UniProtKB/Swiss-Prot annotation:
GO terms for biological process: cellular response to oxidative stress. The keyword Signal does not apply. Its main location: nucleus. Binds 1 FAD per subunit. It comes from Pongo abelii. InterPro entries: FAD-bd_OxRdtase (IPR050260), FAD/NAD-bd_sf (IPR036188), FAD/NAD-binding_dom (IPR023753), FAD/NAD-linked_Rdtase_dimer_sf (IPR016156), Rubredoxin_C (IPR041575). SUPFAM superfamilies: FAD/NAD(P)-binding domain (SSF51905). The modification N-acetylmethionine is found at M1. The gene is PYROXD1. This is Pyridine nucleotide-disulfide oxidoreductase domain-containing protein 1. Keywords: Acetylation, Cytoplasm, FAD, Flavoprotein, NADP, Nucleus, Oxidoreductase. Its EC number is 1.8.1.-.
Amino acid sequence: MEAARPPTTAGKFVVVGGGIAGVTCAEQLATHFPSEDILLVTASPVIKAVTNFKQISKILEEFDVEEQSSTMLEKRFPNIKVIESGVKQLKSEEHCIVTEDGNQHVYKKLCLCAGAKPKLICEGNPYVLGIRDTDSAQEFQKQLIKAKRIMIIGNGGIALELVYEIEGCEVIWAIKDKAIGNTFFDAGAAEFLTSKLIAEKSEAKIAHKRTRYTTEGRKKEARSKCKSDNVGSALGPDWHEGLNLKGTKEFSHKIHLETMCEVKKIYLQDEFRILKKKSFSFPRDHKSVTTDTEMWPVYVELTNEKIYGCDFIVSATGVTPNVEPFLHGNSFELGEDGGLKVDDHMHTSLPDVYAAGDICTTAWQLSPVWQQMRLWTQARQMGWYAAKCMAAASSGDSIDMDFSFELFAHVTKFFNYKVVLLGKYNAQGLGSDHELMLRCTKGQEYVKVVMQNGRMMGAVLIGETDLEETFENLILNQMNLSSYGEDLLDPNIDIEDYFD
């Protein structure tokens, strides 16, 4: 017979997921309820902690992500108990989760922060590698040391960073869009960055700031064996720092870009030989395309009919929310992207079950200048806000929507440039009646502003522009800027003086 649902006073606050959203949520709950035990359930032996947090402006924030052993988290917050195990099942009617180690944990409030997993272009192929967490990034480094040529499929943030960071290895980069970085940039910004790709890298590597913890060397008996298919937490900013991304050859950059195409078929060497297919050699400047005489472990046929051989393929084609362990027997409402739908208090469609980070899909009436993107900044903000909402609901208090959801704001680095994205930076969903204003100094900065009805709706800032705070304010207050015209981007005018 099914156990009766326990009263909501029974059980603990339980958070599932050791990534940025889960750890931030657990830390906030631990601070808010110092005398209560907070359970953090994670399949990984290391957790992701936010360090060196800096609030740059009202909404823009910068931080490092540090991998730490879970014991460090328990030392900082004595009321957090980390359970190193995957989740086998969620029994929402009984208010409990069953972990892979067979234990049941009753919750009064549960927050699911299990992240997302990479969409692999081909499952089960040993030559196809998805980069999502630290383990897969280290496996990639191991493979790269032996590689003469690799193929990168995808156009998101990880693909962009990889293409720039890899040295001493030919890279064929296949994207389905017309220009690189389609998620973040328009064609103009892409062109600005592409010139950096073509140039030889001169910047010396700066030693990485983060302490790296590996899972090797820990006593095996001290932790239960996790299933090998458990998904680790997403990589944080600067994830490639400290990884030696060098192939076998002695050159900096050799990149060939194939645009407007996708993967049609992947062949292993034997199959390729039997079919008597022909592949292209690495394209050289202005030379006619030649047949490759070298044999490769794996071959990729693209939808543009070109075939290239390589040592291995990196699949960087995005992620899907990691909802699978929680769906059986529960009637969650899911978003179009497969995420758990959450309302404006990070609450799912099930009682006392919240979600934050990559696993969730926002289903509230969004601010006109905010959109959900599965980025570290939003994982931190959602985890923090979910904890506040759980605390408020437990105490019977009401809580206002967090201000960070008023404006999309993200700061990162691509190709060694500082990149700030604000609001509808790519005119997402604005229709055709918007206009763009641009300022570009090759090799130094790229500034794009999205205007609609005289109001600033978004901006892309590449380089050290010092415009982020002013533009953030202009987007937030929706002031009519029609009278300023081109002066908005005139480098000889200190725009801050206008709006003091």
